[in-house]
Amino acid sequence: DAGRSILYQTARYVDIYKALEDISRERKLTAEERQELKKYSRLADAFTPLAKGMNSEYANQNTYDAIQVHGGSGFIMEYKCQRLYRDARIFSIYEGTTQLQVVAAIRYISNGTYLGIIKEMLEKEVAEELKPLKTRVEEMVKLYEQALEYVKEGQDQEMHDFLARRLYNMTCEII
């Protein structure tokens, strides 16, 4: 469900961006519309690598687990999970390896774009039964901020490159 949620959110950003782009071909955009176009273009660019990478990794993990549940026999031709497993492996390559998605997302991680979006989401009211989950996310965000600060303070490009995948995974887990 998390993968589907981020996919829908990304699609929403892309749809709004594309709609405004289409309108701009018909007429001149107002100043407010130009701001919206810029905002949603940035959000679409930021969320696309998260949606692709996260869903590719989830698909790989889920199909791997399906093979394990079948005791390995799910890998032979009679089972659908064999095809799904193969497709999931190819999907992550076709959509760009997860490492390419990390490279595409790291600037939005480093410049605080995702952190700002996460904080905006946390400002919203939630139903009473969801408050413990919100508290848990707030705790995760504190750790995320500490990790970001640690990497920024280090000012070591090798360390930054080494930790990029971990920061990407943290971002995906929180968003």
Question: Model segments located where?
Answer:
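Flavin-dependent oxidoreductase catalytic core characteristic
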Residues: 1-175
